[in-house]
């Protein structure tokens, strides 16, 4: 398995990072399943499975937030001191292009990345920036206006709501 080789390679001095840290521990096989999918998708697109890519992907899928490149960079550089923010950002954008992540953009904020590839929508707090995933059949069923339907092919419906989260609303 290529991921195992990447993690155990002599160039990867922190394999315990990916296997021993509690925030990286697997719940119900999900991380292992996602890593196998990661390996398969990378191979399909001709990408090498490097320890840095594995670390970036594991940070992304283990995050309860929708992390920015800076957030992931700050975590990964603890283990890869020479990794650059540009490398992390380009890697995350590559993950988006090959279908391993989605980009969540909002007005004026840096791009945030979402490993949840299932259909869902987002709520973003305009004060603290927290992003929460939610599902809604009514939003999924939104009708496409005829003026758009005649000119475009809609591939995905994503609703992005903005407001105040419960903590910020209480302030």
Predicted regions and their residues:
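Short, Lys/Arg-enriched N-terminal segment that forms or immediately precedes the first helix
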Residues: 32-46
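Short amphipathic alpha-helical elements of helix-turn-helix/winged-helix folds
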Residues: 41, 58-63, 75
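Short capping segments at the starts of secondary-structure elements
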Residues: 49, 63-68
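Pre-recognition alpha-helix immediately N-terminal to the DNA-recognition helix
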Residues: 54-59, 71
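DNA-recognition alpha helix
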Residues: 69-80
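Basic amphipathic alpha-helical segments that dock to polyanions
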Residues: 88-98
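Non-DNA-binding regulatory cores of transcription-related proteins
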Residues: 97-171
